[in-house]
Amino acid sequence: MRYGIGSGALWGLDTVILAIALALNPFATDAHASLVSAALHDAVCALILLVFMAMRGRLKDTWRAIHTRSGRAVMVAALLGGPIGMSGYLLAIDQIGAGYTAIISTFYPALGTALAVAVLKERMRPRQVIALAVAIGAIIATSYTSTSVSGSALWGVLGALAAVVGWGCEAVILAWGMRDDAVDNETALQIRETTSGLTYLVLVVPLGGALSSTGQALTSPGAMGLVALAAAAGTASYLFYYKA
């Protein structure tokens, strides 16, 4: 249960910090703010995990996992969770604020659980259900005080729902990928964040015409520092969530 509480609280913190970053220049006046902040968030998460796994002497485990069927499944899951889920999430924060975004997107574990039961025939233990409920409650409690709408409610809700669907489907694929010993929760998370970060920087950002915006964000210490802080909270949240 402690992992569920930690994951929920840290994810709410991640959301609030990103909302603050999006209110600062250059994000506040940039049409590509959602895309760029999502790309930088996942890229920083990948760098944090690279250092984390290197310090634990586990990079070789990740390298081996990449070449397995389970590792490739995690890569596919990363595309759903990163470019689709994370972009929708940041769009929602930009349009309807951190509070409403967190409250809506917090239901992605519930969707993932429902899909896992339906598709993978998994059975939920009572303590897992309680941990899930506690995580959802922690996110809502952390984010409730920052509920506000600053843009399009329609686009904001659609973005949040894209996050729920992307992350929920990602969770099912990850659960399947981690069924054997080839991929554990830490290697899966590193593969996930590295795949997502590289996909953003190599494909999504250039194709979205956001290279200039990304450069401006990287040279803005205040905004970039907040994105990095949010990424640190997000990485810790992911680690707790994968262990829950």
Give a label for each model feature.
Residues 1-8, 59-88, 155-163, 214-236:
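Loop-to-transmembrane-helix transition segments
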Residues 115, 127-146:
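Hydrophobic transmembrane alpha-helices of multi-pass small-molecule transport proteins
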Residues 36-39, 43, 80, 89-123, ...:
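Specific alpha-helical transmembrane segments that line the substrate/conduction pathway
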Residues 1-39, 150-179, 202:
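Glycine-/small-residue-enriched transmembrane alpha-helix faces in small-molecule transporters
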Residues 19-31, 60-63, 94, 143-153, ...:
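Membrane-interface helix termini and inter-helical loops of multi-pass transporters
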